[in-house]
Regions:
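Sequence-level preference for short, compositionally simple segments enriched
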Residues: 1-312
Length: 312
């Protein structure tokens, strides 16, 4: 095991230095409490990173989309990450990973985590940001505009990436969980920040590929906020086949009566899949949901267990 500690008691004082030192895999990196102001890139598979304490082991950076870089170009969404993962079989436990750049209306998109890999697991982590906190790669198969995907995986293979987020706290405002992965969120808290607008935000923006069995599944999750009632959507389709499914989730009053938004894409009503089953709380209003939102039967919901997800 490799140890990282800011006080010099470990093998390294920098997380990236520890990652770069790995020569034998699998490997585990243990990070002692502290605030590590750096960007971290994970390229090697079968790596595990474990923090000493989820709230006190903090990786943070403040890159953002509207920042003008040395080449005169804007940073853009996909170069704004704090942690970048382009490896399979990566695990992260008991850490905070944050992008501290600020609200999206001021700085644009600002990713805390860019996760593009198969068999990625985040457990007991806190992912903090504002707009586009967590990108669950891969990217959509086609850009909406030229250069929109500029970043570390713009030319990568568009393949199925399966990811699990368990017992995590994820915070943001607009589209703060987005991408094309099949991602399962189990017992997580999704916290929407108040930007004093209506709508105040969107939790998810899936770009699930056509014919992909799973997009986003939220199981036993808690949707919380400091926003006024009826101001936040559960999601909207970044691409027309986007999927977000909620199973037995707690929805507070900030959730919009309609539940989901169509991103002004009426054609997505027949292709996107937004659904709920056995949800509860002040924001759970099946009778007021948009026409394209489905309420699942018990048999249909049985296809969205973690076991079924892993099988596929």
């Amino acid at each position: 095991m490799i140890t990282v500690a800011q006080d010099g008691s470990g093998t390294f004082t920098s997380i990236q230095e520890a990652v770069d030192s790995v020569t034998m895999l699998p490997e585990t990196i243990y990070i002692k409490n502290g605030i590590y102001h750096e960007r971290v890139k994970i390229k090697a598979p079968f790596l595990t990173i474990i923090g000493e304490d989820a709230e006190q082991t903090v990786l943070e950076y403040d890159e953002y989309a509207n920042k003008i870089l040395e080449d005169g170009e804007k940073c853009g969404t996909f170069r704004s990450y704090t942690m970048l993962i382009t490896a399979d079989n990566f695990t992260c436990k008991n850490m905070t990973i944050a992008n501290t750049a600020g609200f999206g209306k001021e700085v644009g998109q600002a990713l805390a985590v860019y996760a593009e890999g198969d068999h990625i697991l985040f457990s007991g982590c806190r992912l903090l940001g504002h707009q586009d906190t967590l990108f669950t790669g891969p990217l959509p198969k086609e850009e909406a505009k030229a250069g929109g995907f500029k970043g570390p995986t713009e030319f990568a293979e568009r393949r199925l990436c399966r990811q699990i987020y368990e017992n995590c706290y994820i915070e943001g405002e607009v589209d703060f969980i987005f991408g094309s992965a099949a991602a399962y969120f189990d017992n997580c808290t999704l916290y929407s920040l108040n930007r004093n607008m209506d709508p105040n935000g969107y939790v998810t923006a899936p770009s699930t590929y056509e014919n992909q069995k799973y997009g986003y599944v939220f199981h036993n999750c808690h949707f919380k906020s400091n926003c006024p009632d009826n101001t936040v959507y559960l999601g909207r389709p970044w691409r027309n086949y986007g999927q977000t499914v909620l199973i037995h989730c707690e929805l507070d009053g900030h959730i919009k009566d309609e539940g989901f938004h169509d991103w002004n894409k009426p054609e997505a009503h027949d292709t996107a899949f937004f659904a709920e089953y056995d949800c509860y709380g002040k924001g759970c209003k099946p009778e007021l949901r948009a026409d394209f939102v489905k309420q699942l039967s018990a048999d249909e919901a049985a296809e969205y267990t973690l076991e079924k997800f892993k099988e596929n």
